[in-house]
Amino acid sequence: MDHRLLEIVACPVCKGKLTFDKDKQELVCKIDRLAYPIKEGIPVLLEPEARTVSMDEGK
């Protein structure tokens, strides 16, 4: 994941900052607790494709 991309992309729900989870290959919005998958190097920033991040994962 190109870290320059993280400076431009935002959560499609709240427009907040996304962080990169290297292990799970996801972009995570800590505000909405949503994780967006990265498929073949491309972030899929569609709310229906996101999974909810559990409280335990958010720690």
UniProtKB/Swiss-Prot annotation:
Name of the molecule in the record: UPF0434 protein VS_2060
Family: Belongs to the UPF0434 family.
Source organism, top-level taxon: Bacteria
GO cellular component, one term: cytosol
